[in-house]
Amino acid sequence: MYEAIGHRVEDGVAEITIKLPRHRNALSVKAMQEVTDALNRAEEDDSVGAVMITGAEDAFCAGFYLREIPLDKGVAGVRDHFRIGALWWHQMIHKIIRVKRPVLAAINGVAAGGGLGISLASDMAICADSAKFVCAWHTIGIGNDTATSYSLARIVGMRRAMELMLTNRTLYPEEAKDWGLVSRVYPKDDFREVAWKVARELAAAPTHLQVMAKERFHAGWMQPVEECTEFEIQNVIASVTHPHFMPCLTEFLDGHRADRPQVELPAGV
């Protein structure tokens, strides 16, 4: 179905694998188009409860695939290529944020530039103890993109975001966890197995409630508290009229759900 990415649906999880390992899984324009299409398919597939984005072999994603830049076409050709690339990057990032499924970034290696942007746009992020994070844009002389000016400071705070961007330093897993870039760190050798376990847990949870939470948290960043609480009321009313609600309430009142977490995550390192 796809040429530039890996894709499969299993156990309610749509796995999207960025696969250009000889270039640390940098994303071509075609790959971005395919990731966006795969996200659209996941949203339309009732059997899919969660999406997992990861990278082939030992890297997550090193950003834009620079080797397809048409240097022989001069400044105008390079500019046009970056304009097209930025448009597709941003369509893909928008879809990760807006897709009506929880998205897990399973960061198995380097996440640089746009790869960092993908991890920030995802709803949850976990990483292997071999991962590393770096802004990287200034290394190649370009401004940051992939909505990092929207997401990075929101997740790690303005001071830390500016430190990462201005110094271009590499962040390693434990510090990334401490800063909130990822929620958990797992050993490299077990990472794919654990990532699939987390994704399956997300997929098994009630999709309509996951989507409500996702939409509310993103909207809440931009809205006054009064608007947030009004939408929360609407979500509560919608959720209690859903067929999922009454069995859950009955179990809870009978004492069967009081201490049961909705999604169980493996302990990290």
Swiss-Prot record:
Changing E68T: No effect on catalytic activity. Changing F64P: Severely reduces catalytic activity. Arylated intermediate does not accumulate. Changing D123T: No effect on catalytic activity. Dehalogenates 4-chlorobenzoyl-CoA, 4-iodobenzoyl-CoA and 4-bromobenzoyl-CoA, but not 4-fluorobenzoyl-CoA. Inactive towards crotonyl-CoA, alpha-methylcrotonyl-CoA and beta-methylcrotonyl-CoA. It is an enzyme of class 3 (hydrolase). Changing G113A: Strongly reduced catalytic activity and substrate benzoyl group binding. Arylated intermediate does not accumulate. This is 4-chlorobenzoyl coenzyme A dehalogenase. Optimum pH is 10.0. Half maximum activity remains at pH 9.0 and 11.5. Stable from pH 6.5 to 11.0, activity is lost following 10 minutes incubation at pH 4.5 or 12.0. Belongs to the enoyl-CoA hydratase/isomerase family. It catalyses: 4-chlorobenzoyl-CoA + H2O = 4-hydroxybenzoyl-CoA + chloride + H(+). GO terms for molecular function: 4-chlorobenzoyl-CoA dehalogenase activity. The keyword Hydrolase applies. Changing A112G: Yields insoluble protein. Changing H90Q: Complete loss of catalytic activity. Significantly reduced activity. Substrate binding is not significantly affected. Reduced arylated intermediate formation. Pathway: Xenobiotic degradation; 4-chlorobenzoate degradation; 4-hydroxybenzoate from 4-chlorobenzoate: step 2/3. Homotetramer. Homotetramer, homooctamer and larger multimers. Homotrimer. Changing A112V: Catalytic activity is almost as efficient as wild type. Keywords: Hydrolase. Changing R216 to E/K/L: Yields insoluble protein.
